């Protein structure tokens, strides 16, 4: 019960604060929501992708320890590409917050 109350209060309090300022608009609130979703989902996707990449590399090293160096190099290259997804999400969030 307490968790639900906290979730409801967390969702309502920013709207109350924005209404008190007098500048509140639905469009601005949706921009903030979109920016939060952009970075949140991009981070989630990147985290899941990195987890799968590291797991695959560890399984490969466990099967063939001699290929560890090559697999580690390929994993780091793959992690760099996966991390760009999170950076694109951050870029979209900044565009939504400061340009639109």
UniProtKB/Swiss-Prot annotation:
Organism superkingdom: Bacteria
Subcellular location(s) of the protein: Cell inner membrane
Membrane-protein topology: Multi-pass membrane protein
GO-annotated molecular function: lipid binding; proton-transporting ATP synthase activity, rotational mechanism
Bilayer-crossing regions: 30-50, 80-100
Keywords: ATP synthesis, Cell inner membrane, Cell membrane, CF(0), Hydrogen ion transport, Ion transport, Lipid-binding, Membrane, Transmembrane, Transmembrane helix, Transport
Site features described as Reversibly protonated during proton transport, chain residue numbers: 83
GO annotations of cellular component type: plasma membrane; proton-transporting ATP synthase complex; proton-transporting two-sector ATPase complex, proton-transporting domain
Family: Belongs to the ATPase C chain family.
Assembly and oligomerization: F-type ATPases have 2 components, F(1) - the catalytic core - and F(0) - the membrane proton channel. F(1) has five subunits: alpha(3), beta(3), gamma(1), delta(1), epsilon(1). F(0) has three main subunits: a(1), b(2) and c(10-14). The alpha and beta chains form an alternating ring which encloses part of the gamma chain. F(1) is attached to F(0) by a central stalk formed by the gamma and epsilon chains, while a peripheral stalk is formed by the delta and b chains.
HAMAP family named in the record: ATP_synth_c_bact
Function field: F(1)F(0) ATP synthase produces ATP from ADP in the presence of a proton or sodium gradient. F-type ATPases consist of two structural domains, F(1) containing the extramembraneous catalytic core and F(0) containing the membrane proton channel, linked together by a central stalk and a peripheral stalk. During catalysis, ATP synthesis in the catalytic domain of F(1) is coupled via a rotary mechanism of the central stalk subunits to proton translocation.
Descriptive protein name: ATP synthase subunit c
Record gene name: atpE
